[in-house]
């Protein structure tokens, strides 16, 4: 285990605190694998969030142009929760360790959130929602509360899990790469399981009581998926934390005999004031990258149901239109499963491919252009689907096979740049924080702001922006393609290259 005493930076006036001291030997590989497995449980639930919850909230009665607002809670909680959790997990003096208490708290919050989301329709109906009169305002309120708690829980889990792996690796380059390779692998496992569950039409039969008067087929499947998700998360978390112990951490006293203690917000703002040019460039490229990614991550399955399959998710839509939409959403979940498989294999090859292409920044720049091309190709797939419906009188059976295959191919190819997005920015942040002596938790929290601020912008403006250009999802996808291209140019031209022997080059991490 790593024991990091906290010391003031050398100039004495710094708002950043550094973590220094003797490093213990890295832990055994089986313990690293055990902690990495928590990523499968977290990512199972995150996959369900991405694939099923945007369509579901529209079925409850929120119009498409406002559906993205439900995601606003995610960036806000990420902006506040992850840096705060990172800060306090770096300093936690619990007898159970620095990271484990936060992981347990996060798993408990996920459990609460899952029940609120899964039973939102049932609770709303019991409180007075009419089954045939949308919008179901009470169900929407319960759903939004659960959604908010779920995002807080995910952010409470993710940061300490990442930091725990760094602690277990004890600064050893080989163990760091190995630990994060396994973290990446289990992320892919969770994604595949989550998207596979979301694509299966009759999953509710595994838990038949999930279908009720107020919870239809789609709702029952979603409820069952989340039950499976929380079961997996609780099992892997319990096993990992019982097996892998942490040493309690004690802060090193300062010259006056007291432990150093800088107020959190003073430290976080101080971190921004002291950022060097490499970190600023990383934040800019990361922000543009997420402006490109987030519209697609929010609306990929909605795009399949609405533009590709020609369905309608509005609460007042016909049963036939809703069926087409649900078929498209399930096809989108299948596409996301293919995406997760490609992401998993690509993650294992990031380090090797990066070396062959001449470094991390060149690899990131190249895959950002792949992202831009794929987002632009959604326009082509959409036009082909629209032409088919026009030529076949509305095509109530969905798109032809070649259109569906084209859409699924885009999902799969996008796994390549997504693997890089989940790895290189976090690896570079770890490298820069190591060079400056800043705590891993705080540094990853600062990088997280470059992810959540674009998410907030898209959550607030995505729906109205689409509506301004005629509705649907394509306008935001085109904007994303432009942002991806700009991000690629900046990654190749202004982003500094990390040292070739950087220990955390392959630090693959998730996001929330």
Swiss-Prot record:
Its main location: membrane. GO terms for biological process: sucrose metabolic process. Optimum pH is 5. The keyword DNA-binding does not apply. Residues 1-31, 87-100, 160-177, 245-278, 354-362, 429-440, 495-512 are cytoplasmic. Keywords: Cell membrane, Glycoprotein, Membrane, Sugar transport, Symport, Transmembrane, Transmembrane helix, Transport. GO terms for molecular function: sucrose:proton symporter activity. It catalyses: sucrose(out) + H(+)(out) = sucrose(in) + H(+)(in). Expressed in leaves and, to a lower extent, in roots, flowers and stems. Highly specific to the phloem, exclusively localized in companion cells (at protein level). It is a multi-pass membrane protein. Induction: Induced by sucrose depletion. Specifically induced by H.schachtii (cyst nematodes) in nematode-induced syncytia. Gene3D superfamilies: MFS general substrate transporter like domains. NCBIfam families: GPH_sucrose (TIGR01301). Homodimer. Interacts with SUC3 and SUC4. Belongs to the glycoside-pentoside-hexuronide (GPH) cation symporter transporter (TC 2.A.2.4) family. This is Sucrose transport protein SUC2.
């Amino acid at each position: 285990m790593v024991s990091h005493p906290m010391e003031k930076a050398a100039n004495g006036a710094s708002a950043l605190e550094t973590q220094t001291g003797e490093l213990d030997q890295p832990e055994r590989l089986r313990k690293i694998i055990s902690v990495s497995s928590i990523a499968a449980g977290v990512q199972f639930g995150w996959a369900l969030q991405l694939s099923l919850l945007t369509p579901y909230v529209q079925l409850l009665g929120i119009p498409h142009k406002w559906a993205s607002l439900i995601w606003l809670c995610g960036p806000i909680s990420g902006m506040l929760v992850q840096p705060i959790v990172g800060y306090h997990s770096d300093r936690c003096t619990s007898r159970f360790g620095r990271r484990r208490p936060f992981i347990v708290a996060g798993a408990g919050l996920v459990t609460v959130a899952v029940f609120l989301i899964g039973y939102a329709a049932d609770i709303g109906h019991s409180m007075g929602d009419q089954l045939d009169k949308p919008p179901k305002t009470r169900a929407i309120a319960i759903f939004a509360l659960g959604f908010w708690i779920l995002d807080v829980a995910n952010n409470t889990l993710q940061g300490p899990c990442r930091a725990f792996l760094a602690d277990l690796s004890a600064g050893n380059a080989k163990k760091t790469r190995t630990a994060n390779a396994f973290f990446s692998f289990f992320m892919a496992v969770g994604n595949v399981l989550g998207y596979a569950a979301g694509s299966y039409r009759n999953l509710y039969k595994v838990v038949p009581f999930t279908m009720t008067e107020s919870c239809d087929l789609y709702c029952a499947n979603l409820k069952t998926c989340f039950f499976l998700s929380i079961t997996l998360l609780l099992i892997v978390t319990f096993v990992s934390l019982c097996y892998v112990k942490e040493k309690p951490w004690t802060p090193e006293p300062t010259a006056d005999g007291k432990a150093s203690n800088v107020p959190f917000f003073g430290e976080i703002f101080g971190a921004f004031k002291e950022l060097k040019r490499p970190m600023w460039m990383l934040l800019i490229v990361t922000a543009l990258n997420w402006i490109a990614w987030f519209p697609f991550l929010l609306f990929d399955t909605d795009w399949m149901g609405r533009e590709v399959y020609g369905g309608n998710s509005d609460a007042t839509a016909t049963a036939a239109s809703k069926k087409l939409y649900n078929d498209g959403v399930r096809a989108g979940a299948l596409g996301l499963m293919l995406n997760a498989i490609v992401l998993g294999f690509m993650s294992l090859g990031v380090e090797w491919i990066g070396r062959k292409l001449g470094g991390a920044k060149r690899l990131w720049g190249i895959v950002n252009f792949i992202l831009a091309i794929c987002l632009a190709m959604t326009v082509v797939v959409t036009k082909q689907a629209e032409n088919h419906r026009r030529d076949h009188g509305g095509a109530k059976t969905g798109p032809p096979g070649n259109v569906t295959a084209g859409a699924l191919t885009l999902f799969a190819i996008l796994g390549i740049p997504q693997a890089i997005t989940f790895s290189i920015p976090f690896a570079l942040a770890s490298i820069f924080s190591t060079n400056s002596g800043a705590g891993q938790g705080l540094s990853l929290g600062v990088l997280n702001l470059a992810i959540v601020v674009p998410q907030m912008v898209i959550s607030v403006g995505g729906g109205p922006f689409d509506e301004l250009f005629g509705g649907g999802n394509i306008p935001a996808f085109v904007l994303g393609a432009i942002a991806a291209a700009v991000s690629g140019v900046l990654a190749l031209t202004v982003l500094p290259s990390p040292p070739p022997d950087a220990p955390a080059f392959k630090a693959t991490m998730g996001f929330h």
